[in-house]
């Protein structure tokens, strides 16, 4: 039996997700100062925005300095074809927490976008790893 035939005979898993309209959050963000941005992101449910829902983020924390922590419990749907969690999950967690940390440290009317990201993977992530946490810390805001 070929892989394709064997694969077609197996039951497929399903997962659904929902999210709030992302532009609603973005429009609010532009009109908020640093303190109100921190409050907005502290109150934001991790599954209420598209990427948080899609990737299965479980918790967001924002400290008094605006540094963000994003949490996720790896699940089977995060796996790649070689049997480990896809590296994109770690990269997305890092990008998300760094972005939110930046937003929480910007003045009203400004937003920041990621222009570059480099991830060095130190070990494999699997469902056995348990909850993973990414923490964003802003050392310097650039232009």
What label would you give each PLM region?
Residues 1-143:
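Terminal targeting signals and extreme-terminal segments of soluble enzymes
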